[in-house]
């Protein structure tokens, strides 16, 4: 059931910012941007649409996709840490930054160690952690294609502004640890599980749509100028907020329900088809 939308009139392009989730949305199941989708995105960027790669990944884990789309040349942004940071790919400038409260780094790490859960964070090169051989640290390294560096004492090592601490551990223990953390750090941090073995600990109120709102405001635009594509629960606020919220064919039912349009799945150029339809097709 494809929603029928009125075509915009005149030559003023309505969607000036295009926010894309990565895994399950921009990339197929082999984590590749398929040719039709890549061509559509590059054409959109060349028309002046600002492409925002939006993910819970660290900045360093998104950079290869930004390079592949040539956003450093064509213009675009990386929204990392689920909205904790937005950088301009052309200038390298930080446009939005939500810093993890420095005074909570030690308490979170101490709590994690007590429950046999490993904390990690990121620097410009990759992961920083107290146990680089931990299999779940290895999983985060593999997902982002980044190395892990081992340090003796993580809180002592962190001398730069971080955007999140990721806690990794046995999926059997994680629901309990998540619950305890939410009690202990209530009103101080945003805490949720992003995978059975991952607990994200973030500054309060950080999520994709809130950071996109700041970016749009900086550009003198509003949600009506935003098109967003996603597939997972963490994309829900962004899909609801955008003037054109697009759900992938492989999206969870809640995202499909919230979206204005449902496109093909990530194995069949869902993003490319939606960009062709709403951005590249000339207004009639």
Regions found by a protein language model. Give the residues of each.
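Conserved acidic, metal-coordinating active-site core of Asp-based
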Residues: 111, 115-229, 233-235, 241
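Hydrophobic packing residues within well-ordered alpha-helices of enzyme cores
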Residues: 37, 62-66, 177, 181, ...
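Asp-based phosphoryl-transfer active-site loop
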Residues: 16-30
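Short, structured coil segments at secondary-structure junctions
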Residues: 69, 74, 82, 185-187, ...
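Active-site phosphate-binding/coordination module
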Residues: 35-136
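Mg2+-dependent phosphoryl-transfer enzymes with acidic/Ser/Thr/Gly-rich catalytic loops
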Residues: 13-17, 34, 200-284
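Non-catalytic pre-domain segments flanking phosphatase-related domains
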Residues: 1-20, 39-42
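Short active-site oxyanion
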Residues: 48-52, 76, 164, 224-225, ...
